[in-house]
Amino acid sequence: MNYIDIDSSQHELYDSWRKLYTVSFPIFEQRTQEQQEKAFSCADYHLVGYSEGDMFVGFISYWEFSSYRYIEHFAVHQGLRGRGYG
């Protein structure tokens, strides 16, 4: 499995991430496009995509602080859930 930092809305995996993000979390837990761009500008914010071959598997987003990491979102593609990716 490959781990890929998604660091902007211009990243090649951004659209795959956004699709999974919007179907995996209720609207009140989702960022707007503007809010996501602001998160990308913070050094503490990380969005990591996971792929296997050319298949987008899932992602994790987290904030890394000096004494802890806060996992904000984690999701696996609907068709791949229950297969050990999480």
Model-predicted regions and their roles:
Residues G49, D54-W63, Y68-A75:
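Conserved beta-strand in the GNAT
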Residues E34-E37, Y62:
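Intrinsically disordered, low-complexity segments enriched in polar/charged residues with Gly/Pro
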Residues M1-Q35, S51:
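Short amphipathic alpha-helix that is part of the acyltransferase structural core
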